[in-house]
Amino acid sequence: DFPLLHRASFAVETAAPELLLAVLLCGSLYMPPTDSALSARNLFDLAEELAFRRLAVGLAAAERADGGGGEGPVSCPPRLYETLQAALIVHALQSTMRSSTARRRNRTVRLPALVSAVRVLGLAKTKHAVADLMMMAPEARWAQFVQAETRIRISTWTLLSDCQQSGVFHCPQLMTTLEMTGSLPCLPELWNAASHSELDQVICASGRDCLVRGASIRVAVETLMAENWDGPEAFPVKPLTLPDLQVLVFSIHSSMRNARFASILPAAAPVVARAIDRWQELWDLAARGLTAEELSRRGLVRHSGELCWLARVMLDVSMSEDAERSSAYLQGVAHDSLEELHAFLRVYCSLDD
């Protein structure tokens, strides 16, 4: 729902081979089920191995070039961003496979590698330095904006991948909203600008504040869970988009699961419940201008309202006395199949109906 790759600067001739392969295989999922499209899935393991080997090598080289690592984040060479993007795409592709071995490897080996890279490179702290950007020449401003936004999107994609794995397989999350102190992904019209002149036109039309968004993921989540609430109009993220709300509802889910895993959900439940209510209020306002057909064309973000419903159901069930007896999903931690989640949904969707 917010693209990971910057289309205007992506070049087949110069892109990293692992990124080209990842993009090609991702495209095969959207093709008609021809023999060639289906056979492309045989390359998923190869693409995974290539991307993550190059990520390990590139990260080690960056740390050596930075003096062996020490205080503060390691400088990231441009090529390493492409390797990280490739690894994220392949990680998402492998999550669609039916192999329990691939799922377990995705969760226990590949995801920790992604989270570690985000932390070593300090990506989750990245903010657009608006004052500095506006003093640059147009071409330099565009290049700097794209690089910072790429860092922001890589860290946000990693957080969402972690949330998704945690939710589907009921396992502790690796990343936290606490460390997401950088900027939110920018507005689509900025990311989709085809040139430096088009980017400047968008900034001129919308004002330089369009680069800032007002708050980080951490601040947004803390606002949803705070004791005081001044209503949607005082929410710090402006303008608030549907993809923003998708990130926030995933974060609410992760906060609820983390509280349950730490055996403090009874104390945290009122905080989570009011965050759900406030999120729903924001969603109703943000989505009210869209028809059902328009919302259906918005990718995975269209399911955010359903995720909010699911958060409410999971909170209620988790707080019940027979939570673990009534749900195989809640009984264990770190499942290797989707069956436990599917069984939970079958039971509680039917009860809700």
Question: Which residues does each predicted region cover?
Answer:
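Long, amphipathic alpha-helical regulatory blocks in the mid-to-C-terminal portion
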Residues: 1-3, 42-70, 116-128, 208-353
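An N-terminal domain-cap segment
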Residues: 2-14
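Structural signature of alpha-solenoid helical repeat scaffolds
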Residues: 15, 78, 150, 298-300, ...
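Start-of-helix signal in alpha-solenoid helical-repeat scaffolds, especially tetratricopeptide repeats
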Residues: 17, 21, 84, 152, ...
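Acidic, Ser/Thr-rich, low-complexity intrinsically disordered regions in fungal proteins
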Residues: 17-20, 26-230, 284-291
